Amino acid sequence: MSKTVLSKIGALLLPLIFSVFCAFPSFAQTENTVTIQAKDIALEKVMQQIEKQTRCVFLNKDVDVKENVSVNISGKTLSETLNILFKGKDIDWKIDSGHIIISKKVAQSKATEGKATTSQISGVVIDEEGVPVIGVGVLIQGTTIGTGTDLDGNFSFVLPEGMENSSLEFSCLGYTTQVLKIGNRRVFNVTMTSDAILMEGTVVTALGIKRSEKALSYNVQQVNADEVTMNKDANFINSLNGKVAGLNINASSSGVGGASKVVMRGMKSISQSSNALYVIDGVPMYTTARDGGTQFASQGSTDPIADINPEDIESISVLTGAAAAALYGSDAANGAIVVTTKKGKEGKLSATASASVEFMTPFVLPRFQNRYGTGDLNSSIGSDVRSWGNLMNDANNPKYSPAKDYFQTGVTHNESVSVSMGNEKNQSYLSGSSIDSYGIVPNNRYNRYNFTFRNTTSFLKDKMHLDFSASFISQKDKNMTNQGTYNNPLVGAYIFPRSNDWEAVRMYERYDVVRRLSTQYWPIGDAGMTMQNPYWINYRNLRENRKDRFMLNAQMSYDILDWLNISGRVKMDQSTTKYTEKFYASTFTQLTESSQNGLYGISQMTDRQIYADFLVNINKRFGQDWNLQVNLGTSISDMFYDALKNRGPIADGQMSAERAGIANVFNVQNLSNSTKTTRLQDGWREQTQSIFGSAELGFKGAYYLTLTARNDWPSQLAGPHSNRKSFFYPSIGGSVVLSQIIPNMPKALEYFWNT
C-alpha cells in the first residue's frame, strides 16, 4: 500500500482516536485515589461512586445500605476511603480480587459464646463441576434474613432464635433455586444445578433481532469467532466448511482470497443463483458480481464478503431455509449468513495481537503416467502434445512432475492487532490487519489491509444508545487463476508431454532479432485449445486488480419504556475497483483479438450501497405465562454501479489506414480502432423500498407461534407497463418445547414440533 494511502488513513483516523481517548477518564488515577463529596445521601449511592472510580464491586453480606451518610473525601486511597466511610459503624470490610466485601460485625459476649456453634449458619456453595459459586443468595425463606456467598462460595450468618423450623433458600440467576429445612442442621454444603431454561441462549436472527433459541421455528446454527480464527483463511467463509450442517462451500480455483459459493441444503435453481445472503450487523451485503468476461477474457475474482477481517467477527448465525430469512425477502430465499462484529468492552484498555504463517501445497493432483514418452503410436495428428509414444527408460525419462517442477510452496502471512477500551458509558474498538500471500503458481499475489474503528455510547440516563463504525479495506490481487482452458497455466502444466524437457520451457521467452523483442517459447503449440507456456501466462498475461472499499455504519436506539424501544440505522458501502489486462506480443492471437502486438484492457468500476431502516420493537410479558415480541419496520436499499471500460488489441497495422502501434506499450492511445476494441461506459441504479413485521407469541415458555411478513417495492417494477408493483413474503412457524411440559425429557427429544 502506498505512503499516500497510509497518510490519508492516518489523517482520517487520528482525530477519531484522539477524541475517543480524551473521552475516557484516567484509569490509573481512578485506581489509586477516590474523591467524593456528599451530604446526607444513602450509603448505597456512595458505594456506587466508589465502584465507578475504582472499578471494584461491592459484595454485601446483610449490611443495611439505605441509611444516609455524609462524606468529604479527596484524593484518598481505597483503603483510606473505606476506613473513613465505615468509621464508627457496625460494619466489617475487606478487599479481595477486585471485590469489596462488607458484612455486619458480630459481637458475642462470653455468656453467649458457647451457644454460637448452635446459632451460626454456615457452609459452601459449588456448581456441578465443583467450582465455588459467588453471589448466591442464602435467605431464610419468607424473610430478608441471610447473606450471600463470597469469592470462595462460603457464607455464614447468625440464625435468630425461634427460626429453627424455617427453611433456607439458595437462589442465583442461571441456577435452580433450592430450599432446605434448617432443623438442627447448622452446616449446609450445597451443589447448585444449572437451570436449563434460564441458561437458554439467545441467537441473532434476521435484521439483527435477538431471540430465544428455543422459540425459533426454524434451524439456526451458531459459529463462534474462535472457530473462524483457529485456522484462518483469507476468505473467512471457507473456515465454515464442515462446521455447519447442510452448508456446502465451494471455494473457487482463483487462489487465496477468491470468491466462494455457499449453498444451503442443495441447489435451488438451475438458471438463478443459489448463493446465500450475507448480513453484517443486521445490514444485508448485496453481492454485485463482476462480469467474468468472455471465454477469451475471463478473470478470477474475489467476493465482497471476503474483505471482512476474521479477527473482527464476534459470532456467526447461519439461517437455513426461506422461513428463517423471510424478513429479508427474496434476497434471502437461499438462506442467510448473519455476521456480528466485535465492539469495545467496558474496563481497562486491552490489546491483542496475533500473527500466523500458512504454507500451501497442492493437495490432490491427477495421476500421471511416466512409462510412455511424447507421441501417439496410433495417430500422427496432434501427437506432439500426447504422451502415448514409445516406452521410456531411465536414460530418456526426465520424470517431469507438476507438483515438484511447476508448483511452488505458497505462503500466507497474516498479522492483526486490536484495541478495546471504555467505561460504562462509552466503549471503543480499533483493529488493523494485513494479509500477504504468494500463491502456489508463480507470480500470483494477494494483499489485503483492513482498518476498523467502532464506538458505542449511551446517554440520556442510558435510554439512548449510539453505535458508529468505519472501515477501510485496501486489496490488491495479481494473476488469480482462471477456470477453464483459456489463460489457465494448469492446462500446459498438466498436458506437457512426459518425455520433453521441462527445464527448456522454464525460459518462457526468447529474443526475436527480427521483431526486436522477446517472444513466447512453447515448442508444442496450442494443441487446438489455445494452450500456452504456463510461465508465459504467469509473467506475460498479466491480470491485476486493485480495490479500495469504505464502509460507514451508524445506529441509534431509544428505550421509551422497559418493553418498548425504537431504533434506526444507516450504512454506506462503497468500492472502487481498477482492473487491468496486459497480454504481451506473441501471446496466441486468438486471445489478443488477432493482434500480433498484444492486448490491453483497463476497467474502472464503482459500486455503492446505501441502506437504511427504522424499527419499533416490543417485548412484553402478560402475567406469568404469556410473552409477546413484536418488531415492525421499514427499510430502503439503494444500489449504484458505474463502469468505464477500455479493452482491445494493440494496433499492428493490419487494418487499412491504421498505423501500427508499439508492441508491449499498454495504454488506450495504442489500441486499434477496429470493431474488436471496446470503449464502454456502463452503469445502473436500482432501489427497493420495504415494510416488514414479525410477531412471536409464547406461552409458559413451551409453546411458540411466529408470524412474519414483508412487502417489497423494487424499482424494476416501477415502469408503466408492469403488471405488478410489489411482492409479498409471508411466513408462519411454531414450536413446542416438550422439556417444559414433560419432566426428565431426554435432550434429543426436547423439540417436538419445529416447523
Identify the residue ranges that each predicted region occupies.
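Small-side-chain secondary-structure face that scaffolds active or pore-lining regions
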Residues: 439-452, 471-473, 479-484, 544-549, ...
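A surface-exposed, glycine/aromatic-enriched loop/edge motif typical of exported proteins
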Residues: 366-385, 473-524, 581, 636-662, ...
